[in-house]
């Protein structure tokens, strides 16, 4: 059977008080709308239409990589009106459509699959995703009879008996497409808000004798984010889910409460993550790594048996058995080889560092290609910027760079070379050479006495 999905993402989001469209606020590093789209896609639904309104162009721009179509809701006149704006998408389609809201980032793939399966197997005309809550105040109640769902009653319209019902409407549904399109044409805005409610379609189908079903899920999956407080609540719930998944997969989190792991991060088994770490984007961390406290790793590939201590790594690759930090800054487009050592207060930008190379402390390397088994003394600076352009430095294998050295780019240091401490290198150093580029030491005898400085 053909299955498709609509995602309502046109709302103003006034309570979140932001210039950014509400559905583009992030939860665990990913926009809420993308969370919803990705869960739908993982459930096997490829045909997805997003109803957009506020910030439409930005919403399109941020979701271009999700291969969805768009329908425009120029005026926000209710959920029924939003779905009606997707009539062109639904035109001539037969099968089942699920309707979601773009501000429910916690919905699970398995729940979506269950919703579709129940709808199809029970031969329902409409199926509502519901949840049981201790305090359903403000939510629409699900009224059931022996033959399924009888109606959805808004909180303000509930009788005393209906107020006791703790099964609430999540705002997520499945419909037979043709029946939905017909019901949408019969919905009116004859209510206190002057809006077209999608819930009225349920009542219309029920009045026609159609079968309405419901699938119950956990309340947290149905949470809609309408404020910064709810955004933080969703963040906490998803963070806990992610951390639990990694621990179940063989990763040790010393303190899950203070460990932030983005939803797309991958971590190998027997890796230990210490407190106060932030792992974001498409980061991949290998097996048997130690990520000590206060590190931030974004969109980077970390090999096996790597130690990272209190460092920032951005869009870079770190080879197996390498140590980084403490207090290292690995900037984008950097690749560090295996068995390397990047020490304290080292900054590396857009450079390649070979296997076994040691850059132990207080060094800047930018726009450089560094070979294997090199050693950088304390205070080395690759001078890559002339005030207008960046230039490249090449350093061969087995080179030794003495302390307090400046390498003025563009410059090439060949294999097996030594650079004397305190040198400023501005020209090529041939293989096997020692380069000394500093003023000759001169001692002035008796100078302290002559100046009257002796203590």
UniProtKB/Swiss-Prot annotation:
Note the SUPFAM superfamilies from the entry.
Answer: Nucleotide-diphospho-sugar transferases, Trimeric LpxA-like enzymes
What pathway is this protein a component of? Nucleotide-sugar biosynthesis; UDP-N-acetyl-alpha-D-glucosamine biosynthesis; N-acetyl-alpha-D-glucosamine 1-phosphate from alpha-D-glucosamine 6-phosphate (route II): step 2/2; Nucleotide-sugar biosynthesis; UDP-N-acetyl-alpha-D-glucosamine biosynthesis; UDP-N-acetyl-alpha-D-glucosamine from N-acetyl-alpha-D-glucosamine 1-phosphate: step 1/1; Bacterial outer membrane biogenesis; LPS lipid A biosynthesis
- Map out region (Linker) in residue numbers: 229-249
Keywords, in A-Z order: Acyltransferase, Cell shape, Cell wall biogenesis/degradation, Cytoplasm, Magnesium, Metal-binding, Multifunctional enzyme, Nucleotidyltransferase, Peptidoglycan synthesis, Repeat, Transferase
Q: Where in the cell does this protein reside?
A: Cytoplasm
Enzyme active site: 361
CDD domains, per database record: GT2_GlmU_N_bac, LbH_GlmU_C
Q: Which annotated residues bind acetyl-CoA? A: 384-385, 421, 438
The kind of enzyme this is, by top-level EC class, is transferase
UniProt: UDP-N-acetyl-alpha-D-glucosamine binding residues: 8-11, 22, 73, 78-79, 140, 154, 169, 226, 331, 349, 364, 375
For whether the record's keyword set contains Flavoprotein, the answer is no
List this protein's GO terms for biological process: cell morphogenesis; cell wall organization; lipid A biosynthetic process; peptidoglycan biosynthetic process; regulation of cell shape; UDP-N-acetylglucosamine biosynthetic process
The cofactor note from the UniProt entry for this protein is:
Binds 1 Mg(2+) ion per subunit.
Keyword check for ATP-binding = no
Cofactor(s) recorded in Swiss-Prot or TrEMBL: Mg(2+)
**GO CC entries:** cytoplasm; membrane
Positions of the UniProt region annotated as N-acetyltransferase: 250-455
Q: Which residues bind Mg(2+)?
A: 103, 226
Assembly notes: Homotrimer.
Family annotation (NCBIfam families): glmU, PRK14354.1
The role this protein plays is: Catalyzes the last two sequential reactions in the de novo biosynthetic pathway for UDP-N-acetylglucosamine (UDP-GlcNAc). The C-terminal domain catalyzes the transfer of acetyl group from acetyl coenzyme A to glucosamine-1-phosphate (GlcN-1-P) to produce N-acetylglucosamine-1-phosphate (GlcNAc-1-P), which is converted into UDP-GlcNAc by the transfer of uridine 5-monophosphate (from uridine 5-triphosphate), a reaction catalyzed by the N-terminal domain.
This chain belongs to the protein called Bifunctional protein GlmU
Which organism does this record belong to?
Answer: Clostridium beijerinckii (strain ATCC 51743 / NCIMB 8052) (Clostridium acetobutylicum)
């Amino acid at each position: 059977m053909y299955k498709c999905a609509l995602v309502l993402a046109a709302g103003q989001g006034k309570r979140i008080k932001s210039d950014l469209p509400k559905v583009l606020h992030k939860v665990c590093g990913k926009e809420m709308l993308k969370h919803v789209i990705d869960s739908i896609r993982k459930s096997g639904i490829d045909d997805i239409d997003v109803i957009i309104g506020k910030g439409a162009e930005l919403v399109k721009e941020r979701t271009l990589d999700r291969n969805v179509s768009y329908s425009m809701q120029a005026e926000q006149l209710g959920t029924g009106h939003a779905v009606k704006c997707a009539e062109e998408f639904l035109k001539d389609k037969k099968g089942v459509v699920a309707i979601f809201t773009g501000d429910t980032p916690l919905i699970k793939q398995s729940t979506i699959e269950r919703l579709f399966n129940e709808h199809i197997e029970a031969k329902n005309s409409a199926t509502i995703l519901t949840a049981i809550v201790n305090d359903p105040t403000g939510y629409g109640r699900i009224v059931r009879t022996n033959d399924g769902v009888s109606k959805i009653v808004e909180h303000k319209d509930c009788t005393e008996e209906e107020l006791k019902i703790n099964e609430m409407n999540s705002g997520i549904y499945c419909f037979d497409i043709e029946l939905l399109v017909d019901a949408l044409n019969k919905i009116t805005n004859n209510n206190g808000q002057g809006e077209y409610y999608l819930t009225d379609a349920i009542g219309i189908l029920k009045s026609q004798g159609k079968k309405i079903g419901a699938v119950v899920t956990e309340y947290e999956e149905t949470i809609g984010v309408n404020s910064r407080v709810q955004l933080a609540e969703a963040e906490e719930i998803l963070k806990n889910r992610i951390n639990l998944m990694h621990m179940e997969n063989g990763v040790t989190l010393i303190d899950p409460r203070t460990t932030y792991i983005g939803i797309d991060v991958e971590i190998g088994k027997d890796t230990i993550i210490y407190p106060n770490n932030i792992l974001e984007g498409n980061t991949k961390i290998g097996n048997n790594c130690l990520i000590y406290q206060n590190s931030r790793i974004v969109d980077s590939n970390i090999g096996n048996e790597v130690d990272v201590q209190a460092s920032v790594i951005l869009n870079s690759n770190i080879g197996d058995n390498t140590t980084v930090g403490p207090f290292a800054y690995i900037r984008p487009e950097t690749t560090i080889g295996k068995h390397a050592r990047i020490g304290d207060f080292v900054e590396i930008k857009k450079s390649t560092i070979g296997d076994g190379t040691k850059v132990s402390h207080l060094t800047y390397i930018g726009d450089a290609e560094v070979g294997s088994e090199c050693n950088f003394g304390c205070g080395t600076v690759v001078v890559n910027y002339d005030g207008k352009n960046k230039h490249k430095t090449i350093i061969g294998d087995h080179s030794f760079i003495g302390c307090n050295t400046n390498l003025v780019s563009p410059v090439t240091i060949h294999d097996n070379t030594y650079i004397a401490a305190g040198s400023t290198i501005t020209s090529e150093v041939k293989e096997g050479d020692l380069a000394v580029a500093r003023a000759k030491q001169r001692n002035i005898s008796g100078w302290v006495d002559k100046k009257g400085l002796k203590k």
